[in-house]
Amino acid sequence: MVKVKDISDFIDSIAPYNTKCEWDNCGILIGDKNKEVKKIGFALDLTSEVLSDAIENNVDLIVTHHPIIFRPMKSFLKGNLAYDLAVSGISAISAHTCFDCAKGGVNDVLCDLLGIKNTVGVPDDECPVPMARIGEIEPVKSEDFAKKVAETLDTVCRVADSGKVIKKVAVCGGSGPDDFIFTSAEMGADAVITGEIKHHIFLAANEIGLTAIQAGHFETENPAVSALKKYINNKFNDVECILLKQSKPTKIIG
């Protein structure tokens, strides 16, 4: 019999919880660690849409990237998503920054999708081990590379375009820290990709001649949800694993 704890222990073995950023929340967040698991649902976020789909599909456990409990809760009342999840009897596990850092995790999946080879970690001060990756691609014009990113991730990119030929690329799925572009540039990056970029970081990228591509938080992390599903399905082949329905949180207007 597979239990919630078994799934959590396996995730801990491939994406150790102790590699998460200090401010993060990973592991079993809601539920019974000894509950039997016959069906797991996967999603980037635990939203009301995701929970409804999980209930409809009779899942025992939801595994998400982003934690449903991130900051201390001041109340736990009916109508609160965490309360509704607990009442449903479904358990929840988060594999957040530990899976960003992991081999085969968020940033390795991004590199594979975009054809980035010979990757190494990009150090940062927030996590015990590097989250971001930097590697090589076949030389391509910056605008053409940005178009490839948009097409591959089914997104719209906002770009600080250096106009240079791109040979070395750094990636950080989700929201890369402010120093990500500077560290990447020092490591020889011609371009960086992340989900969210602040205005002053775009300005800085232009000043140092670095192509900076903002490709969307959801879009840069969501592909890794399928990867985590595959890893768990391969380990526990007697447990049914499904992707839960989750709409993109934003749409393009104009």
Where are the regions that the model predicts?
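Active-site catalytic microenvironments in core metabolic enzymes, especially phosphate/sugar-handling
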Residues: M1-G254
